[in-house]
């Protein structure tokens, strides 16, 4: 019994604890009507609710802490796999690119017209190695960057949830926490600022300043002007043409891609205009094209749909003269997007101003209707509703600038007409007020002067009478209906006439306004698009003129010791073209005005440094020295016009010393001429000139193994002056002649076997004209062109002339079983012979830049001689 009682007490205690009983109420447990105290239960529920909220609040704080902190190390496995990609969002003006199998960082940079260093900076790469399948951010060619932001310097978001979600969670937690908790724990009241991953560090900024990337134009000599990018680094200067340029698409990028080491640059000068007479006469550069290109493309990207929005916005802003000042055209065009919150106040004020204008500028008929309404003392509710509906119709017929407003106004008019004609109680109310209106009209006709003199008083009485009629209509509606039936049973005809009068008046005004609106809107719609296009073109032209005024171009002249190398050809071809253009030591570029100072600072700061000539001298001299205008005299290389047009010039140390020596030498020579002093150098130079003139005929007269039947002695001497240096001193050996070997190309190839020297081809045609070619290698059968830049063409028709390699291409010599050809390009050969060595043809070509060698384009071969040098 004792154990059973203890068991019951234990179970009872559990139930009591579970149900929230007070232990003091155990004695009264058998009573069924007794209920636990509600205060204890409410307290327990509140504690349970607070516990649950605290758990949720701590959970949300933990989530926010994990989302806004990237240094705690509590990242998930997925975040670790793609942690670097999640560390920043895609910068503005970039697009994603997946690395392919054969891609490298240099090839990707070349494909998207950028530099490898910029790709490293955009993607936060630790090395230049890329793997297939890797995602990279590359510049978007269709993106138009603004002045405020650029793709490389766009801010990067931290590794955190979206800002809207974070703010929502923070505000929710703050509202749920008690005020004491907020004040006592500031760590939880506000979210800790997260560590934002910056887009560029100080080291990267310093690194990016070590090169200049300038959009400019390369002005060539006789090959046009192309747009491209000039890349200036401390070690090299490189120009890459734009692939979208018309000349590049026509002739290829091989013609315009150039590069040279910085140590080869002897002088870099900036000019206001081109001082080279050849380039100045043949090339005209559009100085405003680069400066206004971005603004022009930005205006051109406005779609026709946006034109409609812009015009409507300009309409609203122009009509709202009472509330806002009119904006200029350029300012209205610069605001591409208007939010609804910005436009809604303008539209509301516009409607209010329209209502004011309507009240002030109503017609005579509307004034008469208003005068009649002022004299009405007792009017029904339906009549007042109809009058308000008609006023709404008039308001809705105000100009809105589009067709949808007209259609809506017509629909509102039809609805208002239907509301006038509908309702069972309308006829009763009209019949009730018809007599009052008739009396008012008669009183108006008889008391016109009184009404006009007491206009202000009647206006005040009008408001009072309308309010009284409104209250009286609600209170005594039934009484008025019975009175109308008893007293005015014969007034239905007058009410019908009044209704027709009101309807005709309203319809006439609505029709008049609708016709005016349709006519005006049609004109606006027909002239909107041409006007908008003309407006944009005008704005663009004004912008272009303004940019030309403030952003004129400057011309950069680079003088080098060796010709620049082609970058889009093989190394062997580049070396050969560099040899062919060995006389071209000057290159011109049209750069924007604001980049002139950048180039000047770059050459001074980041130019390669050269050691001094003295071995023991530890000090270094800068790579370039600034040349001042007062250091130049008449004996310098620059003329007076050159000095006037030049803004600044930096020269290498070697060039600076050379100019100083030349200046000193010229001053010394001037002094000697003034004092009539003859130096030893002048005497030796005069004697050497006399000796050279005496020995010149003998030195250029080679020994021939056989007498030539085609060349005279003076012609041989002229040809000898243009032969390659490795042929001088060797006798001329006749290896083939049509008089000895016959006229056969196969025989000619057979006689060339075993030779390893240049050969001279001399042709005489049926017109007795002498011309030919010097081949750097013996003639042979080949699948493609062969030879070197030593090859040239010559003619004695009518005078002696030599055409050497221009460097445009390497189509020197081509031999097969049926023909022998020299030069090429454009589908024509400079010199062509058939397999029988009987027919020939000569034409201009790009390889040698020659004219037609013979008197006629097609000729007949009379005799051929081939001489070797061995």
UniProtKB/Swiss-Prot annotation:
Question: Compositionally biased, Basic and acidic residues: which spans?
Answer: 61-85, 167-177, 345-360, 454-464, 473-484
**Residue intervals of the LysM domain:** 95-138
Q: Which Pfam families match?
A: LysM (PF01476), TLD (PF07534)
Give UniProt keywords alphabetically.
Answer: Mitochondrion, Stress response
> Mainly resides where?
mitochondrion
Family indicated by similarity: Belongs to the OXR1 family.
Instruction: List the protein's name.
Output: Oxidation resistance protein 1
């Amino acid at each position: 019994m004792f154990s059973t009682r203890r068991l019951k007490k234990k179970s009872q205690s559990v139930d009591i604890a579970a149900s929230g009983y007070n232990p003091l109420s155990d004695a009264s447990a058998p009573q069924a009507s007794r209920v636990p105290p509600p205060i204890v239960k409410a307290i327990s529920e509140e504690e349970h609710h607070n516990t649950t909220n605290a758990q949720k609040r701590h959970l949300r704080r933990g989530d926010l802490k994990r989302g806004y902190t990237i240094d705690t190390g509590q990242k998930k496995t997925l975040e670790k796999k793609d942690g670097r990609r999640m560390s920043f969002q895609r910068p503005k003006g970039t697009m994603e690119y997946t690395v392919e199998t054969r891609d490298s960082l240099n090839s990707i940079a070349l494909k998207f017209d950028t530099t490898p260093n910029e790709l490293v900076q955009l993607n936060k790469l630790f090395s230049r190695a890329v793997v297939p399948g890797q995602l990279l951010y590359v510049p978007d060619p269709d993106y138009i960057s603004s002045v405020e932001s650029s793709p490389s310097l766009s801010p990067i978001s931290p590794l955190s949830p979206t800002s809207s979600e974070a703010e929502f969670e923070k505000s929710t937690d703050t509202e749920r926490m008690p005020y004491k908790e907020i004040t006592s724990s500031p760590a939880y009241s506000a979210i800790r600022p997260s560590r934002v991953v910056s887009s560029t560090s100080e080291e990267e900024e310093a690194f990016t300043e070590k090169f200049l990337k300038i959009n400019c134009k390369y002005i060539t000599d006789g090959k046009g002007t192309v747009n491209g990018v000039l890349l200036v680094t401390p070690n090299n200067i490189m120009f890459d043409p734009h692939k979208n340029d018309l000349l590049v698409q026509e002739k290829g990028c091989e013609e315009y891609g150039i590069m040279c080491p910085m140590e080869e640059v002897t002088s870099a000068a900036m000019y206001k205009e081109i001082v080279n007479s050849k380039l100045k006469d043949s090339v005209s550069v559009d100085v405003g094209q680069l400066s206004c290109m971005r603004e022009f493309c930005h205006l051109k990207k406005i779609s026709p749909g946006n034109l409609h929005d812009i015009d409507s916005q300009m309409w609203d802003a122009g009509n709202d003269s009472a509330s806002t000042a009119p904006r200029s055209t350029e300012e209205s065009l610069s605001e591409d997007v208007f939010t609804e919150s910005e436009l809604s106040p303008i539209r509301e004020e516009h409607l209010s101003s329209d209502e004011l204008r309507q009240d002030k500028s109503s017609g005579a008929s509307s004034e008469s209707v208003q005068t009649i309404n002022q004299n009405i003392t007792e009017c029904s509710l339906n009549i007042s509703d109809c009058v308000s509906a008609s006023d709404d119709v008039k308001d809705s017929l105000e100009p809105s600038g589009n067709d949808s407003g007209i259609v809506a106004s017509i629909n509102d008019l039809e609805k208002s007409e239907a509301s006038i004609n509908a309702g069972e109680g309308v006829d009763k109310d009209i019949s009730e007020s018809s007599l009052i209106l008739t009396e008012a009209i008669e009183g108006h006709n008889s008391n016109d002067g009184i009404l006009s003199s007491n206009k202000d008083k009647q206006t005040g009485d009008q408001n009072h009478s309308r309010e009284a009629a409104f209250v009286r209509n609600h209170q005594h509606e039934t009484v008025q209906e019975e009175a109308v039936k008893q007293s005015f049973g014969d007034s239905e005809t007058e009410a019908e006439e009044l209704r027709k009068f009101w309807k005709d008046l309203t319809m006439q005004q609505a029709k008049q306004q609708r016709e005016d609106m349709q006519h005006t809107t049609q004109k606006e719609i027909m002239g909107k698009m041409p006007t908008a296009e003309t407006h944009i073109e005008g704005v663009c032209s004004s912008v272009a003129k303004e940019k030309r005024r403030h952003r004129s171009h400057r011309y950069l002249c680079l003088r080098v010791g060796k010709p620049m190398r082609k970058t889009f050809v093989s190394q062997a071809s580049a070396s050969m073209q560099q040899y062919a253009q060995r006389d071209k030591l000057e290159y011109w570029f049209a750069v924007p005005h604001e980049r002139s100072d950048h180039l000047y600072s770059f050459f001074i700061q980041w130019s390669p440094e050269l050691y001094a000539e003295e071995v023991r001298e530890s000090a270094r001299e800068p790579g370039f020295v600034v040349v001042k205008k007062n250091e130049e005299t008449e004996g310098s290389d620059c003329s007076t016009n050159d000095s006037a047009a030049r803004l600044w010039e930096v020269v290498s140390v070697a060039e600076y010393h050379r100019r100083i020596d030349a200046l000193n030498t010229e001053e010394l020579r001037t002094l000697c001429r003034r004092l009539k002093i003859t130096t030893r150098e002048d005497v030796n130079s005069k004697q050497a000139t006399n000796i050279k003139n005496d020995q010149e005929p003998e030195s250029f007269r080679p020994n021939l193994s056989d007498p030539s039947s085609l060349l005279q002695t003076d012609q041989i001497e002229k040809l000898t002056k243009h032969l390659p240096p490795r042929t001088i001193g060797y006798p001329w050996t006749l290896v083939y002649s049509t008089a000895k070997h016959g006229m056969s190309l196969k025989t000619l190839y057979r006689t060339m076997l075993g030779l390893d020297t240049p050969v001279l081809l001399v042709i005489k045609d049926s017109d007795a004209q002498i011309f030919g070619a010097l081949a750097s290698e013996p003639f042979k059968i080949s699948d493609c062109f062969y030879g070197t830049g030593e090859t040239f063409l010559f003619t004695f028709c009518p005078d002696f002339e030599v055409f050497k390699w221009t460097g445009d291409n390497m189509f020197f010599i081509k031999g097969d079983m049926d023909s022998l050809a020299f030069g090429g390009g454009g589908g024509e050969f400079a010199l062509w012979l058939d397999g029988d060595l009987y027919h020939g043809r000569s034409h201009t070509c790009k390889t040698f830049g020659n004219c037609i060698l013979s008197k006629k384009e097609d000729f007949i071969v009379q005799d051929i001689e081939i001489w070797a040098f061995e």
